[in-house]
Swiss-Prot record:
The gene is SEN15. Pfam families: Sen15 (PF09631). GO terms for molecular function: nucleic acid binding; tRNA-intron endonuclease activity. This is tRNA-splicing endonuclease subunit SEN15. GO terms for cellular component: tRNA-intron endonuclease complex. Signal peptide: none annotated. Gene3D superfamilies: 3.40.1350.10.
Amino acid sequence: MSVSYNGGLTGLTALVRNNLVHYQQWSDVEVVPLRDREALRGRPAQKLSNDDEEIGVEYVLPVELSQYRSSGVTLEALDKVFSQLPASCKRVVLAISSDDGTVVYYTVYQGLQRPRKN
């Protein structure tokens, strides 16, 4: 989706940004330009994991469902994304959008993540 609106953002980035701000109630959401795509960063309304001590800045990678299905989201592609983000970023939230505008979120961690203790 390369339609441009909402201040020059691509349609996908604008869709995910609006979903984060208006439905998920994130604050301070802004675009992070990467080499070959756009990401977003912002503060969620609540912690994304029980392991988090406090609410911090999270990075979101908008992805179309067709990219996800066609293996456009590979470990290599995610490594490239992590290499362009601050070293303190240990996870990225994938925002997968379908053709009807529905957005679902999945968390992807950099490297291996130990299972949490109950």
